[in-house]
């Protein structure tokens, strides 16, 4: 009887241990399956009742984790019909071509960005995506110069890169000051009844004066739109040289802008990478005469060598790099002395990490850097944080900067600026002013009973 009782006790003890072991396995599995930091939802937010062109074009990406944490990034619509824009965004969110750091076989610079591996945003944590490495392919002796490849090319798509990174950095808890000088970018034309026309000198004065009164100490004038239409109507195709008549129109606008800017503001002229060597020279001479601080991007990357030779004809400072996708391109531009200021586009070059690396390259070469961000306040702040306090940074350029200073705008707390320098540490949108549309969602599998 005693033996049987002991046996029963042992059996019961074993059963209890087994149940406990199974329960612990179930708990461990449940814990493993529960990933509170995993991104499961991507939404697109648009302003319900836009009061300006900036607000009507603003798009905000919201990434949400299983725990309910959210991260935000923004960009501007890029001309696609709404359904195509949403489909494009969903595809890019689900396959984010994160940059990697690979040894560049052509130069000693190790930061050349390789492509080839896509990384999924949904189903991963922000930390995993931001730190993902691209796949090594031993024996492959070539890295694509196109940067992120064809899926990232096309009007406006590069803006999505910095937008997604801004949202991921927000989720990852990226904080800190964004102390950089701001430079709003404005066009020299305006739209009327569906067509674009050049501004009048008086209109240009008013626009620059308004920015000056808002506290900005630099302004960037974009030469595109109406000017390109004029050249096309003349049967010209890039690279071209503006005829004297068109140069005269530009000259009047530069003179008006400089008069309004006075000595308190720098005036920057941004060409559209569409000029020939003669075209660049003639425009540079006009800029010199109007005491323009910097002429940006007069020629495309494919004319890098020609630009290096042609700039010997004038002393106007040149910025370069608006269409560069790789650090190698900047290194070659520096080697050929094609300019004194590196002007990387945050989207084209690959986002925050590569903007920082470009600034490092400028510092090593004893040059300066003036990045361009084609996004709203969230993307602007993400880039500003990465460059805060660096002496080689002249300014950070983006459109509609004055809109983000307004008290009644789409931000809960508007951006703050002192003496033309951004002093805001954080930026939060007012979600009550936005409408939300679900773009992508990961299916969460329920536990089997």
Language model: regions and residue ranges:
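A cross-domain feature marking catalytic cores of carbohydrate-active enzymes
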Residues: 75, 184-186, 221-223, 269-273, ...
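Shared catalytic-loop signature of beta/alpha-barrel
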Residues: 91, 285, 291-294, 302-422, ...
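Bacterial N-terminal signal peptides that target proteins for export
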Residues: 2-14
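Metal-dependent enolase-superfamily TIM-barrel catalytic cores that perform enediolate-based chemistry
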Residues: 179-308
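Short, Gly/Pro- and small/polar-rich lid/capping loops
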Residues: 29, 33-59
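Metal- or metallocofactor-binding catalytic centers and their adjacent structured scaffolds
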Residues: 64-170
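Bacterial N-terminal signal peptides
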Residues: 12-23
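Glycine-rich, aromatic-flanked loop segments that form ligand/cofactor-binding clefts
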Residues: 151-194, 214
